[in-house]
């Protein structure tokens, strides 16, 4: 089957689309990446997404309209990946669309029950591409008592499980998440959870203090020094004290967190602030490894993915934090994969599993009561 996996993450970099060929299903799946592209959001759409993400500035009319606008954006992104690959849209069998997360509440808060909302209307995508769309992957896991995240562990087991090596798959997107993949001979469980911020705080600080979208290659962070009082403040965040399974998002580490941090530590240089929040991302990852993973699993390799794996300052901080743990650290490209395409490929795989009526959540990762088939299916017009 030819499947397009579509992902728009918490970093708001744009729409990632992976055109993938998949044979079979489950652990026997054979997955080939044909082409990958990122279609940037136009400024107007990005601004509307940012407004929709803000509890103070959002409204239902905006979200309703944006749902359909993003559906059109996602459809156009699918057309673009096919065009770049010289691949006929008529040959496409399926689209797996994650959507744009507007709000994610993994746990009960007063009378607000666990819930999640991703938008990007699948009917618009199906109509515009004349292709069946599978979307809304997180809700069935939450209906089964899970947190709806992380969902990539299923695909990571298919792609990265090794005959003899125990691996950690560390994604550093807007939020960071880790998947523990025991080797094929092991009887230990696959576990996965969010480790905290990825690029989210770094990018927000860059935009506010340097008027730059992100710290390219970590060049600015390389110039500053870590301020211990800022790092201690960040590392005291309640999320780091919670036990897995757990998930987080912009609600905990977005604009509100950064506003409070910059107000509290405004006396420090902007370079030092950026260096310190970069160290916070690294330290929060290392903290979770040492507390929840390394005491129970012997890890041979750590494989980094997502946009944060291109931040050499962040990667070096991670290497220093793990230098005594006797595990090799790679990025996706070192082992023949793409850091950028990883999550879009994951949702192509999840769409394939839903098409075959296979459960594809990992209850040991999300906390769900059982394995469930994920996603809603939207057929194109007859």
Swiss-Prot record:
<dbReference type="GO" id="GO:0016773">
    <property type="term" value="F:phosphotransferase activity, alcohol group as acceptor"/>
</dbReference>
<dbReference type="GO" id="GO:0005524">
    <property type="term" value="F:ATP binding"/>
</dbReference>
<dbReference type="GO" id="GO:0009254">
    <property type="term" value="P:peptidoglycan turnover"/>
</dbReference>
<keyword id="KW-0547">Nucleotide-binding</keyword>
<keyword id="KW-0418">Kinase</keyword>
<keyword id="KW-0067">ATP-binding</keyword>
<comment type="similarity">
    <text>Belongs to the anhydro-N-acetylmuramic acid kinase family.</text>
</comment>
<dbReference type="GO" id="GO:0006040">
    <property type="term" value="P:amino sugar metabolic process"/>
</dbReference>
<dbReference type="InterPro" id="IPR043129">
    <property type="entry name" value="ATPase_NBD"/>
</dbReference>
<dbReference type="GO" id="GO:0016301">
    <property type="term" value="F:kinase activity"/>
</dbReference>
<feature type="binding site">
    <location>
        <begin position="9"/>
        <end position="16"/>
    </location>
    <ligand>
        <name>ATP</name>
    </ligand>
</feature>
<comment type="pathway">
    <text>Cell wall biogenesis; peptidoglycan recycling.</text>
</comment>
<keyword id="KW-0119">Carbohydrate metabolism</keyword>
<protein>
    <recommendedName>
        <fullName>Anhydro-N-acetylmuramic acid kinase</fullName>
        <ecNumber>2.7.1.170</ecNumber>
    </recommendedName>
</protein>
<comment type="function">
    <text>Catalyzes the specific phosphorylation of 1,6-anhydro-N-acetylmuramic acid (anhMurNAc) with the simultaneous cleavage of the 1,6-anhydro ring, generating MurNAc-6-P. Is required for the utilization of anhMurNAc either imported from the medium or derived from its own cell wall murein, and thus plays a role in cell wall recycling.</text>
</comment>
<comment type="pathway">
    <text>Amino-sugar metabolism; 1,6-anhydro-N-acetylmuramate degradation.</text>
</comment>
<dbReference type="GO" id="GO:0097175">
    <property type="term" value="P:1,6-anhydro-N-acetyl-beta-muramic acid catabolic process"/>
</dbReference>
<keyword id="KW-0808">Transferase</keyword>
<dbReference type="Pfam" id="PF03702">
    <property type="entry name" value="AnmK"/>
</dbReference>
<dbReference type="InterPro" id="IPR005338">
    <property type="entry name" value="Anhydro_N_Ac-Mur_kinase"/>
</dbReference>
């Amino acid at each position: 089957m030819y499947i397009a996996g579509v992902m728009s993450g918490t970093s708001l970099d744009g729409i990632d689309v992976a055109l993938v060929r998949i044979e079979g299903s489950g652990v026997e799946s054979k997955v080939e990446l044909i082409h990958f592209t990122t279609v940037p959001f136009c400024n107007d759409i990005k601004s509307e997404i940012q407004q929709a993400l803000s509890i103070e500035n959002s409204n239902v009319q905006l979200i309703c309209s944006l749902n359909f606008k993003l559906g059109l954006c996602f459809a156009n992104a699918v057309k673009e990946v096919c065009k770049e690959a010289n691949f006929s849209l008529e040959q496409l069998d399926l689209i797996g669309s994650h959507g744009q997360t507007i709000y994610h509440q993994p746990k009960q808060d007063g009378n607000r029950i666990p819930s999640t909302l991703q938008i990007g209307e699948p009917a618009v995508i199906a109509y515009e591409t004349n292709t069946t769309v599978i979307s809304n992957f997180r809700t069935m896991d939450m209906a089964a008592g899970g947190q709806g995240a992380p969902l990539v562990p299923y695909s990571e087991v298919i792609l990265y499980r090794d005959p003899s090596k125990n691996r950690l798959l560390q994604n550093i997107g807007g939020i960071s998440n880790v998947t523990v993949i025991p080797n094929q001979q092991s009887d230990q469980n696959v576990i996965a959870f969010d480790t905290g911020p990825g690029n989210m705080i770094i990018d927000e600080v860059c935009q506010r203090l340097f008027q730059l979208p992100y710290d390219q290659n970590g060049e600015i962070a390389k110039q500053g020094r870590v301020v211990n009082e800022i790092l201690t403040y960040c590392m005291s965040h309640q999320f780091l004290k919670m036990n897995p399974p757990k998930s987080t998002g912009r609600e905990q580490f977005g604009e509100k967190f950064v506003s409070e941090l910059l107000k509290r530590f405004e006396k420090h240089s902007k370079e030092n602030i950026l260096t310190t929040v970069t160290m916070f991302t690294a330290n929060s990852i290392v903290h979770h490894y040492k507390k929840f993973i390394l005491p129970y699993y012997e890890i041979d390799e750590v494989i980094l993915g997502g946009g944060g794996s291109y931040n050499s300052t962040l990667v070096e901080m991670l290497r220093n934090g793990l230098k005594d743990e006797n595990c090799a650290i790679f990025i996706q490209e070192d082992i023949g994969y793409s850091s950028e395409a990883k999550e879009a490929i994951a949702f192509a795989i999840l769409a394939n599993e839903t098409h075959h009526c296979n459960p594809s959540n990992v209850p040991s990762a999300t906390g769900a009561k059982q394995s469930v088939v994920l996603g809603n299916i939207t057929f194109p017009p007859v």
